[in-house]
């Protein structure tokens, strides 16, 4: 750093890498401390090295740091579990995708998760280790995530509960490792192992890795601008857990935005900022910059004032044009989105103009306990009724013919249905956002 401008990076080996922009995405590695019972060790995720010294450098240029905590559950061998004693949780019949491209195909081979529960015996075993728990003996003083407390925290705070859910989640298709969600813990390994073996279906469980708590440095995000650039140093950007967030999507979205803005900075172009009514990324960053956080921040739909506008189905419509303008979304992707939007709007227009006669409409309406009509009425009006869905209006000959003639896919049909069903709410929210 020279004259409050970033000059580059010096590695631990003393190698200098010059750059006009630098993005720090340190995760939980800054002065990290891992706790497993009474054992404490420096290191990031299990087996990785800590980042030591960087916090002091940043504090030396005026940045203020804090300390946070998170935790992770044990990883176990899925082959050692008895799933017949658990409740199966199959995946969605028609799973949605994160991507709107046609490159990824629908999942055809999903692996089920399972649910089991702790019990009073498990709780007694866990309590027997509280004296050696860093959560209770004062070794951990940092603030952890409010919405995913450790199992020892749950049985201590909710002592009236006889059991807590455990979600048994496969790590992937090509591994036998399972993630025991709901059992995050920093208790000693022997207590973790003994307690899990008292859980139904886990009587013969084999461990890969124990759970642990992890403390790390972060920098309160009020020290950043909305571009995720630090206010103190031009060209220096922070993204992810260094800003006090927790969660994969939260970190990934910040990394994307910081990377975009670091690139724009080098090209001497205006920063790219998403507003609260444009994307959840906009809500996330605005919350961090304006309100800050003293506990690991997680994104919820309830944090957004305009969540009727920020829907999963229209993410491509909202953001692809912006991505294309930045050069990170292809022309093909933009054209695909425009075609989808055009078809959806035309389908909505069809419902607005097309009428249906009582003799065709009433059997459908009556089957859904919806009031019959006495004269021809617009399909849009009938479709807007709360208990009438796309499956119902597809029973009208004209609707099914339109879908087939225009080769409408599921995305287009869903988009049109949402625009019809929520038209009043969407219009009202757009009006509020524009004020």
Where are the language model's segments positioned?
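Residues forming the flavin
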Residues: 1-325, 329-330, 335-356, 362, ...
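Extended, charge-enriched "interface" segments that sit outside catalytic cores
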Residues: 303, 309, 320-435
